[in-house]
Amino acid sequence: MVKKTSGRGQRDLKVKVKTARGRKLSSTRWLERQLNDPYVAAARRDGYRGRAAYKIIDLDDKYRFLVPGARVVDLGCAPGGWCQVAVKRVNALGEKSGKAVGRIIGLDLQEMEPIAGCELHQLDFMEDDADLKVKDWLGGRADVVMSDMAASASGHKQTDHMRIMALCEAAAELAFDVLEPGGTFVAKVLAGGAEGTLQRLLKQRFKKVANVKPGASRADSSEKFVVATGFRGRDEA
């Protein structure tokens, strides 16, 4: 659990960063936010590669899809925080005696530093045979497909929204091809008006679809996460 200070204590502990010569004001504000972010501090303390780890922790605490023995695919997995959480929760290293041992496959366009208990592949998940490769690596179908992907920011909110929704829809299509019936799909979206297509698509394929803003998401961010559970299977939709 990440603890936040409040009231006078929070104001007294806040770090201020002076704007150095050559540093933009926006960069200074970003640095200040990082230095004062309890999730950034917690990630360093807990050994996670980024604050995003606490988003999947929040989501899994509520929906319980990362269970021991689960087979998980993490799309756009760099820098690896979600994979690190999944390794622990699905018992990928077999550290929980008497519990089933899960498997984690992480896919990303960029090469990554290894993560114990996770099989990383440098792959574009939009390739035509990506689903076949994933099922081959897993030795079967996945129980969970998850994505914290976001396209590179353009500075234009609607453009960024459309890009991330296109990524989400592509991720959902891969999930339809690799998920076991009863499986779960989790993906980040940005609010902006074009979520309807994805929602309709998921409601056809899953028994339940929820939209959640984890506590670890920044208050000023338009991001939220779609959690679709109870995959019906392609042929049953």
From Swiss-Prot:
The keyword Cell membrane does not apply. It comes from the Bacteria. One of its GO terms (cellular component) is cytoplasm. The keyword Transferase applies. Gene3D superfamilies: Vaccinia Virus protein VP39. It is an enzyme of class 2 (transferase). Its EC number is 2.1.1.166. It is found in: Cytoplasm. Specifically methylates the uridine in position 2552 of 23S rRNA at the 2'-O position of the ribose in the fully assembled 50S ribosomal subunit. Keywords: Cytoplasm, Methyltransferase, rRNA processing, S-adenosyl-L-methionine, Transferase. Pfam families: FtsJ (PF01728). Belongs to the class I-like SAM-binding methyltransferase superfamily. RNA methyltransferase RlmE family. The active site is at 188 (proton acceptor). It catalyses: uridine(2552) in 23S rRNA + S-adenosyl-L-methionine = 2'-O-methyluridine(2552) in 23S rRNA + S-adenosyl-L-homocysteine + H(+). This is Ribosomal RNA large subunit methyltransferase E. S-adenosyl-L-methionine binds at residues 80, 82, 108, 124, 148. GO terms for molecular function: rRNA (uridine-2'-O-)-methyltransferase activity. The lineage of its organism: Bacteria, Pseudomonadati, Pseudomonadota, Alphaproteobacteria, Rhodobacterales.
